[in-house]
């Protein structure tokens, strides 16, 4: 069972435990141990306590500079990382890609060299190409935090999803967690499969055949607790958590879907389908939600929805990642 600290008294214990953190970068969750995932959850619990105070700021990263480098549009993730950095008293260097030398053809590595020359200790980056953060991590001294790369990974989103579930459930062991949507092209799904599996959850992936990942089935040695399903009723039945994923409209243009409305007819999570899940089940979505396509409006704003809570918890989890990767010994 993962213990999430909820009182200031737990902070001293936390500080003595996090010294074993070994990751300089956060690129995905495939190389995280269960113990390291627990450490992130525990640290995020302390950060959430900080965010509940009248003064939502501590000097843990005072004097550090964190740069944000987003090659793709982002509102929630970028704002969340910036607020997390400022809550730890770090200076934030926000690079506007469209108005920088990048728009003139500057390479990723040259841009990173520039950021390091400007004093960046950490770089939060989002890139359309899968693997770009790994290239960055192998070629610069700053800590790299992956805020999403292509179809590959979005580790901080998966971590905040796990943290949000643990705020409502004592453990993820044995929970049925159902993900519905474009699994094949979702970096959120990919990181969640790693993280949720390591936390002991049983995962059901639900989508049309064309949007399910190839080569991932119940015979997988890596993910033995993952089930693929094309029937949403079967997928949601008995679920403890149901997570919708954004349907990327460009998939329809590539011929993988006959139409958005056709998708909604068979795979939308609405009130009728949600009744098949456990009565105390949670409804989640990484956002932005295409209402009445992935989730019905009533489900998005219903009592079981923790979507807004995910946004709030994201700041605490990203504070935890900054804190752990920095090697700071103070809060």
Curated annotation (Swiss-Prot):
Carbamoyl phosphate binds at residues 76-77, 126, 154, 157, 287-288. GO terms for cellular component: cytosol. GO terms for molecular function: amino acid binding; aspartate carbamoyltransferase activity. Its EC number is 2.1.3.2. It is an enzyme of class 2 (transferase). The keyword Cell membrane does not apply. The keyword Glycoprotein does not apply. InterPro entries: Asp/Orn_carbamoyltranf_P-bd, Asp/Orn_carbamoylTrfase, Asp/Orn_carbamoylTrfase_sf, Asp_carbamoyltransf, Asp_carbamoyltransf_Asp/Orn-bd. Keywords: Pyrimidine biosynthesis, Transferase. It catalyses: carbamoyl phosphate + L-aspartate = N-carbamoyl-L-aspartate + phosphate + H(+). Pfam families: OTCace (PF00185), OTCace_N (PF02729). L-aspartate binds at residues 104, 187, 246. Pathway: Pyrimidine metabolism; UMP biosynthesis via de novo pathway; (S)-dihydroorotate from bicarbonate: step 2/3. GO terms for biological process: 'de novo' pyrimidine nucleobase biosynthetic process; 'de novo' UMP biosynthetic process; amino acid metabolic process. Heterododecamer (2C3:3R2) of six catalytic PyrB chains organized as two trimers (C3), and six regulatory PyrI chains organized as three dimers (R2). NCBIfam families: asp_carb_tr (TIGR00670), PRK00856.1 (NF002032). Catalyzes the condensation of carbamoyl phosphate and aspartate to form carbamoyl aspartate and inorganic phosphate, the committed step in the de novo pyrimidine nucleotide biosynthesis pathway. Belongs to the aspartate/ornithine carbamoyltransferase superfamily. ATCase family. This is Aspartate carbamoyltransferase catalytic subunit.
């Amino acid at each position: 069972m993962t213990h999430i600290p909820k009182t200031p008294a737990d902070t001293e214990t936390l500080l003595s435990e996090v010294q074993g953190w070994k990751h300089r970068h956060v690129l995905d969750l495939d190389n995280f141990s269960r113990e390291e995932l627990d450490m992130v959850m525990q640290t995020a619990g302390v950060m959430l306590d900080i965010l509940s105070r009248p003064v939502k700021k501590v000097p843990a990263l005072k004097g550090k500079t964190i740069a944000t480098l987003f090659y793709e549009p982002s509102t929630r993730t970028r704002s969340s990382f910036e607020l997390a950095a400022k809550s730890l008293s770090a200076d934030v260097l926000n690079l506007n890609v469209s108005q920088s030398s990048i728009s003139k053809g500057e390479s990723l590595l040259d841009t990173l060299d520039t950021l390091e020359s400007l004093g960046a200790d950490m770089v939060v980056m989002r890139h359309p190409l899968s693997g770009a953060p790994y290239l960055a991590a192998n070629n610069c001294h700053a800590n790299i935090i992956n805020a999403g790369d292509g179809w590959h990974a979005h580790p901080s989103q998966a971590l905040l999803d796990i943290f949000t579930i643990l705020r409502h459930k004592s453990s993820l062991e044995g929970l049925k967690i159902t993900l519905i949507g474009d699994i094949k092209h979702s970096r959120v799904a990919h990181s969640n499969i790693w993280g949720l599996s390591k936390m002991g959850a049983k995962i059901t992936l639900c989508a049309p055949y064309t949007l399910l990942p190839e080569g991932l089935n119940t015979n997988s040695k890596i993910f033995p607790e993952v089930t693929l399903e094309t029937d949403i009723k079967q997928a949601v039945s008995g679920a403890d958590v149901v997570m919708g994923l954004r349907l990327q409209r460009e998939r329809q243009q590539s011929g993988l879907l006959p139409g958005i409305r056709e998708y909604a007819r068979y795979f939308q999570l609405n009130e009728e389908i949600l009744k098949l899940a456990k009565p105390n089940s949670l409804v989640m979505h990484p956002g932005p939600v295409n209402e009445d396509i992935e989730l019905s409006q009533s489900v998005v704003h219903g009592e079981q929805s923790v979507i807004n809570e995910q946004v709030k918890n994201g700041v605490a989890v990203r504070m935890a990642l900054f804190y752990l990767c920095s090697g700071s010994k103070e809060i």
